Every structure is written in structure tokens, then in C-alpha cells.
Swiss-Prot record:
The gene is DPH4. It is found in: Cytoplasm; Nucleus. GO terms for biological process: protein histidyl modification to diphthamide. The lineage of its organism: Eukaryota, Fungi, Dikarya, Ascomycota, Saccharomycotina. This is Diphthamide biosynthesis protein 4. One of its GO terms (cellular component) is cytoplasm.
Length: 163
């Protein structure tokens, strides 16, 4: 699946040109269609598109520079897989871990834009992300994180310890 199919759109070229309003509408419809709270049966979620994939697709296609690079990769037969800046996937263990005075953990990764602490992930982010995986049996979870100073995104995968 590529970013266009994830959002329920046809692949380029688009005639007429795909507008930002079209993209935003497709994004909202994809979120509603695939959100666990909106599905009729919890089992249906396992076959749906992950919310993080929808968010990543929208982030790429709504940025004109990233969209051009992505469209070029599709044209060149790359099927959009890991194309363009900001589409890297990392394991949580690859990020620098820090603990604050209250015992809360945060993870950091430098961004290609040059910002040393560009990507920041907190325990709260991970806890909030868990609601998307309730009742779903997967080996790892993932969350999309945007750089704090630019438009690049990464996907962070992590395992969850059973309590």
C-alpha cells in the first residue's frame, strides 16, 4: 500500500490536481473509517489500516516538497516505500533515553535538519498511543513522531511488556 491508497485516493497523476481540501477530506475519512472507536467490531481493527500509517501518509502528501519526492518515487517504481525525508523507522532502543527527577522517561533522536533533540517521545505519548492497540494482538506497536523544528517525521516501533 502506498500513501494514496492508504487515504483512499487514486495514484497520481490527478486530473484535476489534488487540492489540500481533497487531501484533508480523505485524511479525515480514513481516520474515521479505521479508528478503533468507530469500528463496529473490535476484530475488524486487525485488518484495518493503522492510524499511524494514515497520519504518516497525510504528513507526507500535505507537504509539497515531500509530496513531489514521494510522487517521483512512485513514478520510478518504488511504490512509495520509505521514500522521501522523514519516513525512517526506528526501534525505541535506538533513541537516547533520559529520566527526569520525577522518574518519567523521555526518548530523543537528532533530526536530519540539524536539531539535536528534534524528535522527542515521552512516556505519556506511549501511554496515549496504547488505546489504538486495545484488543489487538501484535508483536510491536508504533507511533509517528514529528521533529519539533521542521516538517520531518519518523516512525518509532516498540514492544510492550505484559503486566
Amino acid at each position: 500500500m502506498n500513501h494514496y491508497t492508504i487515504l483512499g485516493l487514486s495514484e497520481p497523476p490527478h486530473v484535476p490536481e489534488l487540492t489540500s481540501a481533497d487531501l484533508k477530506t480523505a485524511y479525515k475519512q480514513a481516520l474515521l473509517k479505521n479508528h478503533p472507536d468507530k469500528l463496529q467490531e473490535r476484530e475488524a481493527y486487525t485488518g484495518s489500516v493503522q492510524i499511524t500509517a494514515i497520519t504518516t501518509a497525510y504528513a507526507c502528501l500535505s507537504n509539497s516538497k515531500l509530496k513531489k519526492e514521494y510522487d517521483l518515487s512512485l513514478k520510478n517504481g518504488a511504490n512509495g516505500v520509505k521514500s522521501g525525508p522523514g519516513s525512517d523507522v526506528f526501534d525505541l532502543t535506538e533513541l537516547e533515553e533520559r529520566e527526569d527527577a520525577d522518574g518519567m522517561f523521555s526518548w530523543y533522536k537528532p533530526c536530519r535538519c540539524g536539531e539535536a533533540g528534534g524528535y522527542v517521545l515521552t512516556e505519556e505519548h506511549l501511554e496515549n498511543n496504547e488505546k489504538y492497540y486495545e484488543g489487538v494482538d501484535v508483536q510491536f506497536h508504533e507511533i509517528v513522531v514529528q521533529c519539533g523544528t521542521c516538517s520531518l517525521w519518523i516512525t518509532v516501533q516498540y514492544g510492550v511488556e505484559e503486566e
